[in-house]
Amino acid sequence: MVTACTSRLIDGLPDEVAIQCLARVPLFYYPSLHLVSRSWRAALRSPDLVKTRTRIASTENLLCVLAFDPENTWQLYDPLRDHWITLPIMPSQIRHLARFGVASVSGKLFVIGGGSDRVDPLTGDHDGIFASDEVWSYDPLSREWACRAHMLMPRAMFACCSLDGKIIVAGGFTNCRKSTSKAEIYDPETDRWDPLPDLRQAHSSACTGLVISGKMHVLHKGLSTVQILQGGGKNWLVEDYGWLAGPMAMVRKELYVLSNGCILKQRRGNVPDKMVSCASEFQSRIGFGMIGLGDEIYLVGGVIGPGPTNQCIKQLSDVDILNVMSERPTWRPGSPMSRCRGSILGCALLTI
């Protein structure tokens, strides 16, 4: 027999049930709920709320974006409400952070490594920090940034992925601008970095990371070879997939690329890539972010350089969306970024 009780959260409901009610509320409304009472604010900041949202299948996928302007300011995009939320400024001492890695695990956004892209307006000199080992996490429940355990080494322009609740980084460049084959893995539960086997190959080009079929793939700019983490992190395998070069995005476990003014579905082996949609209208747009969310590909921000019709660089806050699962995929505009504009320095999905 269940006895009536008075809850400190919602009168007449056990706290366990009240937490489930709060977990079903979209994150968009949390700032208003924080104002209800101290007990609600404490409940909304609890790490248990993320676990409850996951357990009752009430998680949301939000798009996280950092653009060149304004400095070190992230925004979150809610696709269901077509709405942008501005986060508190990231408290890093590195000005105009760039060349970093970004990933999402445990309901938090992690910003890893990178260096300064600041240029002295008087002398034209670049800041001396090319790569760093610092790590920051953002908790959307407490709406606060926190400094986490530093990487084992400074790095920039490296591959970074979240996989099985952990973060893996590999390759990139040191602060001396020397390429590295070192790799490491981060556990958010213990706030600790541990080494992984070195990449089989180090290249003097930037690299990115993708998770495909449950494995991390490291791709180097300008090269067709891919390095794949095998055996639960025991070694790396080198494959030549012959993939087209260009911005890539994962949608429903399929890899898409923007190449030669077209969106194509990338395939391995001798299977030809599948044409999905024309994207020729974006050929004059550079420095944009491209990422998959749900059934769609998002193109965010970027710049349009000088040309016959304009004499200066135009920074964009535009968002363009393509549903690759529809019978006839067509581009549609999304709500533009409300604060950020220009080249996209970081782009990731946050599941909360």
Positions of predicted regions on the chain:
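Kelch-like beta-propeller repeat domains
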Residues: 1-352
